[in-house]
Amino acid sequence: MSTPYRDKWTSDCGTVTLYCGDCLEILPTLAPGSVDAVVTDPPYGLGDKWNGGAGGAKSSWRIPASEAKSWDMTTARGVEDLASFGECIVWGGNYYKLPPSRCWLVWDKKQPDNWTTGQCELAWTNLDRPVRAFRMAQCELANEGLKLHPTQKPVALMQWCLKWIESNSILDPYMGSGTTGVACVRLGRRFIGIELEPKYYAIAKRRIQDELNRVKFLEPKQRETQRTLLEVSQ
């Protein structure tokens, strides 16, 4: 029997599972109860400006056409159905026909008024809490290492998103370079990621493997520090 994915990888500790393939084909195959919440940043259709579309900054500013064409597409299919998985955060949710939300998440990029790109990005949620804002300049993404994907979010932003979600098992069906997965590993959450493009799937897999190894290396030192502090307090 054929599988709906090109590749599947599960971490040795069993907390991370990644799929390379179309999320619309893979999602129905996930085991019931395996996903508690969705945190994702799907592609949304600004259009190929170089091809006569109405595209804006994403397809024409700083990003070569050869790179942008792989992700600057029409609105991703299936986003409207993601809320059925429970708690849900969708970046770019203002581009989709989603239900009214009490709690929008705002990424304030701290950009001046004379910049041509947007000063904020919005995430739709189905959370029952007030609007929240995260302030971090987009240029600070460089502090986290190389920019690996055209629409890559800061790990700190995705960790902040997870702060508002109580669920333990997180799904990102539009995984990109794996930033949501890295954030989940850092916070001890389970993660399922799906990415259509093999190039970005490979990048995400490597990043998440590196983060798992980093956390595994730090755990013994953290336990030793906790043990020392406990002994001192006794």
Model-inferred region functions:
Residues 1-171, 179-234:
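Class I S-adenosyl-L-methionine-dependent methyltransferase catalytic core
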Residues 174:
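Conserved glycine-centered beta->alpha loop in an early N-terminal alpha/beta scaffold
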